[in-house]
């Protein structure tokens, strides 16, 4: 029976020889991940199961990132618990100054390779699909079961094929591609399905752009998003990952729930206006929208590519006096690379604040939350009411070029009005 890529990965990690969308199967985990919010809850559930030790310490990673650095005594206690539990279990732990945002550090440190199945205590575990892996976000009770037994139940999802044709133009980034997809199928259009990204446009994307695309598959309601592994993947993993992997692809005659085409040649920078990732317009249609804060970072767009794009706009310019600009490298490695390239100097000279790697304000935790009546434009992945602070604030989503241009202008503008042509 022909299968899609996602179906192949799930079946290969189960005890069944074949399965179809809608079937419920038990799936083995290659890696289980949790953070300072989801981890301690999962530990309590695991203890209630009467299980004292994880199924395999080499396949478990814990990351303190949501409230890093700790914003108060309660968040400090969560991080203390995460570290002490990790030490007791002998699992790898990323703490302050030693990692960054979970979905960035696990990729850049070679934990993720094509063909894996990853269960994560975070909804954006779908990010790992950028490397041809099946990453799915689970609740803390299911994560507890994964920690204890190394498996979880999964209803086999159907697959929506998303074909990117052509090539992206100036000031267009991975964020725009996934916003275009969400605008097309809707925020619930991917329910009970996987988004599989294919086509010449997909193949031409850098790994950082693929991470941005896969990261927001869940914003379309999808189980995950996935790119077939290729030479771009192989080059990225060279000297990062030491485990063997073999590329897998969907069968030519595999069955899809739906097929969608996005023409990159005609795609321009986009903005998701409040209060939904599906409320998407061209940046030209949002021109003139006043901005109080710009936030560039997060697990979807805090890579070195995003920081380079930000620097192209900010270099030689100043942040508007009525705007707060916050820039958050997604990992210590990204931060150090930005320092070595002189990007941090560009940001500081422009009047921006540079933060340690953290989830921070993205989920309304700390370090840049919004007050009532304020509006932000951000490279993060969600803009629901109350997502970044006050429920009476507004959040717009965009790529780093667009966000940085708004920081300079004090309002949403086309990046070309600030910088004539991107260098990279």
Swiss-Prot record:
CDD domains: IPMI
Keyword Repeat listed: no
Top-level enzyme category: lyase
Binding residues annotated for [4Fe-4S] cluster, in chain numbering: 299, 359, 362
Gene3D superfamilies referenced in this protein's UniProt entry, alphabetically: Aconitase, domain 3
HAMAP family: LeuC_type2
Cited function: Catalyzes the isomerization between 2-isopropylmalate and 3-isopropylmalate, via the formation of 2-isopropylmaleate.
Subunit structure: Heterodimer of LeuC and LeuD.
Descriptive protein name: 3-isopropylmalate dehydratase large subunit 2
Keywords: 4Fe-4S, Amino-acid biosynthesis, Branched-chain amino acid biosynthesis, Iron, Iron-sulfur, Leucine biosynthesis, Lyase, Metal-binding
MF GO annotations: 3-isopropylmalate dehydratase activity; 4 iron, 4 sulfur cluster binding; metal ion binding
Family assignment from sequence similarity: Belongs to the aconitase/IPM isomerase family. LeuC type 2 subfamily.
Gene: leuC2
């Amino acid at each position: 029976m022909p299968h899609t890529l996602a179906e192949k990965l799930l079946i290969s990690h189960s005890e069944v020889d074949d399965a179809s969308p809608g079937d419920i199967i038990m799936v083995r985990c290659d890696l289980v991940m949790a953070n300072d919010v989801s981890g301690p809850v999962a530990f309590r559930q695991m203890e209630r199961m009467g299980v004292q030790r994880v199924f395999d310490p080499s396949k478990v990673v814990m990351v303190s990132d949501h409230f890093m650095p700790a914003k108060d005594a309660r968040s400090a206690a969560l991080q203390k618990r995460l570290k002490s539990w990790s030490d007791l279990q002998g699992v790898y732990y990323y703490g302050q100054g030693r990692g960054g945002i979970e979905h960035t550090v696990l990729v850049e440190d070679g934990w993720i390779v094509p063909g894996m199945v990853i269960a994560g205590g975070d909804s954006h575990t779908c990010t790992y699909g950028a490397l041809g892996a099946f990453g799915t976000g689970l609740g803390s009770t299911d994560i507890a079961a994964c920690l204890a037994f190394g498996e979880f139940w999964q209803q086999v999802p159907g697959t929506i094929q998303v074909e990117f044709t052509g090539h992206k133009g100036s000031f267009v980034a991975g964020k725009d591609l996934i916003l275009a997809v969400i605008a097309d199928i809707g925020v619930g259009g991917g329910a009970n399905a996987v988004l599989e990204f294919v086509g010449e446009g997909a193949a031409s994307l850098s790994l950082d752009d693929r991470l941005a695309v896969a990261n927001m598959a869940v914003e379309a309601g999808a189980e995950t998003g996935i790119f077939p592994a290729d030479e771009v993947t192989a080059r990225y993993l060279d000297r990062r990952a030491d485990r063997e992997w073999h590329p897998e692809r969907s069968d030519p005659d595999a069955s899809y729930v739906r097929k969608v085409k996005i023409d990159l040649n005609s795609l321009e920078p986009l903005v998701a206006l409040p209060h939904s990732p599906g409320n998407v317009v061209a940046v030209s249609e949002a021109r003139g929208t006043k901005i109080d804060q710009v936030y560039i970072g997060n697990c979807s767009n805090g890579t070195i590519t995003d920081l380079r794009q930000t620097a192209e706009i900010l270099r030689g310019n100043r942040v508007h006096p009525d705007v707060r600009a916050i820039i958050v490298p997604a990992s210590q490695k990204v931060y150090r690379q930005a320092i070595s390239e002189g990007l941090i100097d560009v940001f500081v000279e422009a009047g921006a604040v540079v933060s340690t790697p953290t989830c921070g304000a993205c989920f309304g935790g700390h370090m840049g939350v919004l007050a009532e009546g304020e509006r932000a434009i951000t490279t993060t992945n969600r803009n629901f009411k109350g997502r970044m602070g006050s429920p009476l604030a507004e959040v717009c989503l965009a790529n780093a070029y667009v966000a940085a241009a708004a920081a300079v202008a004090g309002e949403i503008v086309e990046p070309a009005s600030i910088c004539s042509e991107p260098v990279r």
